[in-house]
């Protein structure tokens, strides 16, 4: 803190004391029309600027009234670059007597996690092996080539068509994991190169939208398994998840579907329909409504390429049915892999945990093997990925032992399962939540 005024000619202008705030005051500013947050004890008013936030206003708004230091560091690999956007938003700092953390968060866990991240940086675990990602892209292109050659050489009979569909579904699933890498800025040092290649992979190779994915997925990472903040647990009344939601639905006598049978109808409307119906419709509408013309152009380039390639073999209607069959196959792969790490964990309302604890509560791992790594796009290391979202996936296994040690030190459970058990736990979790709903519906 400096003092005001000058002391004669040539004297340096002294700093004006910065306003200080208590957590009680900061936590009042957590509304859509009034948003403050804290980063490294500095208080920022993001109310107006949040609409310009590249990651979307929702993800940054989820931290209104809270300390966002670790989330800010996790999402932004170039802190110096993004820091310049914060300067005009600075309105003060935490009062000296205030702790650095809000809601009584465990400062020791926070300190140890930050030390762990520094260790990861010292081990060069945020450094990319570009050959690894080039090989991933090459094998996706190779799969697409094999698919075309199969139908070209063997014709459009049922067997060649099924083989081609499964090969293309595999390439789509793998492209989904690859776009995830670029979307998290985990490949190139410069964000703009990640953004450009992300649009190519998700747009031209998959026909989807980078902006749609960013705004949805970053919310999931910021507040995993938190109702009204994580869009991945917004099931549109089709399923009830965790323990809190089914009991609330039961008490309120909400019965949009027979939730006590959700572990059974999951097989009919979960894996088969998410991508070909819900995501495909939502992505197209989002690009049009929000005027994401660049994303739309990339997506159109995918559809042009697909139909130019396969209409000669199947005709227009046949190619359209073929496309949706591929989406149908890919959807099964995507749903089972993405749900095995989260849906089985705690799903609840906001509990205001520190970054490390919140990610461990909402995520679990699947055992490592060459197949598991490839099949899941290394999302079998979901814990490490959530803790360090910008870390290249080929390094996640290297930091895992240190994460386990930190969990053991603080008595936090580190869950790791065989692949088959992880998949079966999805059904067990849905069955458990369904029973909770039925009990509350009948007796509370």
UniProtKB/Swiss-Prot annotation:
InterPro entries noted in UniProt: Cyt_B5-like_heme/steroid-bd, Cyt_B5-like_heme/steroid_sf, FA_desaturase_dom, Fatty_acid_desaturase
Residue interval(s) of motif Histidine box-1: 180-184
GO biological process: alpha-linolenic acid metabolic process; fatty acid derivative biosynthetic process; linoleic acid metabolic process; long-chain fatty acid biosynthetic process; unsaturated fatty acid biosynthetic process
Chief location of this protein within or outside the cell: endoplasmic reticulum
Pathway assigned to this chain's UniProt record: Lipid metabolism; polyunsaturated fatty acid biosynthesis
Keywords annotated in UniProt: Electron transport, Endoplasmic reticulum, Fatty acid biosynthesis, Fatty acid metabolism, Lipid biosynthesis, Lipid metabolism, Membrane, Oxidoreductase, Transmembrane, Transmembrane helix, Transport
Enzyme's top EC category: oxidoreductase
Motif extent (Histidine box-3): 382-386
Cellular compartment(s): Endoplasmic reticulum membrane
PROSITE patterns: CYTOCHROME_B5_2
Domain Cytochrome b5 heme-binding residue range list: 18-95
Motif (Histidine box-2): 217-221
Disulphide linkage map: none
Protein name, entry field: Acyl-CoA 6-desaturase
Species for this entry: Papio anubis (Olive baboon)
């Amino acid at each position: 803190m400096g003092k005001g005024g000058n002391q004669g000619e040539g004297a340096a202008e002294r700093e004006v004391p910065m306003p200080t705030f208590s957590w009680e005051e900061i936590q009042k500013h957590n509304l859509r029309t009034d948003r403050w947050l804290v980063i490294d004890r500095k208080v920022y008013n993001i109310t107006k600027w949040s609409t310009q936030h590249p990651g979307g206003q929702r993800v940054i708004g989820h931290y209104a009234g809270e300390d966002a230091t670790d989330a800010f560091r996790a999402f932004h690999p170039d802190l110096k670059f993004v820091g310049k956007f914060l300067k005009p938003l600075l309105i003060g700092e935490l009062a000296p007597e205030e702790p650095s953390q809000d809601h009584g968060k465990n400062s020791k866990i926070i300190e140890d996690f930050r030390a762990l991240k520094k260790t990861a940086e010292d081990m060069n675990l945020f450094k990319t092996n570009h050959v690894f990602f080039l090989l991933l892209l090459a094998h996706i292109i190779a799969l697409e080539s094999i698919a075309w050659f199969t139908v070209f050489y063997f014709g459009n009979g049922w067997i060649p068509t099924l083989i081609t569909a499964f090969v293309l579904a595999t390439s789509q699933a793998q492209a989904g994991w690859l776009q995830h890498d670029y979307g998290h800025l985990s490949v190139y040092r410069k964000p703009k190169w990640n953004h450009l290649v992300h649009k190519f992979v998700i747009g031209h190779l998959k026909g989807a939208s980078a902006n749609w994915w960013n705004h949805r997925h970053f919310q999931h990472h910021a507040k995993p398994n938190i109702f009204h903040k994580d869009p991945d647990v917004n099931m549109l009344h089709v399923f009830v998840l965790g323990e809190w939601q089914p009991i609330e639905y039961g008490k309120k006598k909400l019965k949009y579907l027979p939730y006590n049978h959700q572990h059974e109808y999951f097989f009919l409307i979960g894996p088969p329909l998410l991508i070909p119906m819900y995501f495909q419709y939502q992505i197209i509408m989002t690009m049009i409504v929000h005027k994401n013309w660049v994303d739309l152009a990339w997506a159109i380039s995918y559809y042009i390429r697909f139909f130019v390639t396969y209409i000669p073999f199947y005709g227009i209607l046949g190619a359209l049915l073929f496309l949706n069959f591929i989406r149908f196959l890919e959807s099964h792969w995507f749903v089972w892999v993405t749900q095995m790490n989260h849906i089985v964990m705690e799903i609840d309302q906001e509990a205001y945990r520190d970054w490390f604890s919140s990610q461990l509560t909402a995520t679990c791992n699947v055992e490592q093997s060459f197949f598991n790594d490839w099949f899941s796009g290394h999302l079998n290391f979901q814990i490490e990925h959530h803790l360090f979202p910008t870390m290249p996936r080929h390094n996640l296994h290297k930091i895992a032992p240190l994460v386990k040690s930190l969990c053991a030190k603080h008595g936090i459970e580190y869950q790791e399962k065989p692949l088959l058990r992880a998949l079966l736990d999805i059904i067990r979790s849905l069955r458990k939540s369904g029973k909770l709903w039925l009990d509350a519906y009948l007796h509370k």
